Each structure stands twice: as C-alpha cells, then as structure tokens.
Amino acid sequence: LENAAKYLAKYSPVKGIPGALINAQNLGLQGDIAVEQQNYAKAVKFYEQAVKAADNNLTAPMYLRKAGLAEQAQGNEQKAAAFYEEILTSYPASMEARDAEKLLGSIK
C-alpha cells in the first residue's frame, strides 16, 4: 500500500473533462488506501476532493458514500449522515441513493 500511495501522490492532474474523471479516480484511490490504513480522517479529505474534482452523477455519489462510511468508522455519525443526505438531495437517481437511505436509517 505504501508504494501505491507514493505512486498516486506523484500524479499530476489532467485538464479537461476526461481528466476530471481521472483526477477524481486518483483521489478516490488515495482515499481507499487511507481507509485500508485505517486513517479515516485522511480518507474523508481525499473523497471530498474527489467529489469536487468530478461532480457528476456517477462518481460524486460513490465518493460521498465512501466519505460517509469513513466518518462512521470514526464514530462521527452526524458527519456521516450529512454525506448520505447530500447523496439523497443532489443525486437522488444514483445507485448510491438506495444505500444512503439504508445507511441513514442505521444512524437515526
């Protein structure tokens, strides 16, 4: 994981629409590595950056869900709920919206 993290950290963002998706994926992968290392706060930051890098109906709700799960892993249920609510509000037709409803139900 350390080698992968170092490799991804060297990545230079790409401009343009295809670049936005690649940039988001890079940030998301760094978040995934942080989760594997149980560094959930760092993971949340990467997932938030991934959402900003490519705010679309496919990747944004996925990274919001991952950010919520990372917040729950830290015991931050209110912050997790905010991520799930954002999915329901901003991306109600996404695949993650169903999961977000279930995850919100488990918190409340």
List the predicted regions and their residue ranges.
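Short solvent-exposed coil/turn linkers within tandem alpha-helical repeat scaffolds
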Residues: S12-A24, V51-T59, L88-D99
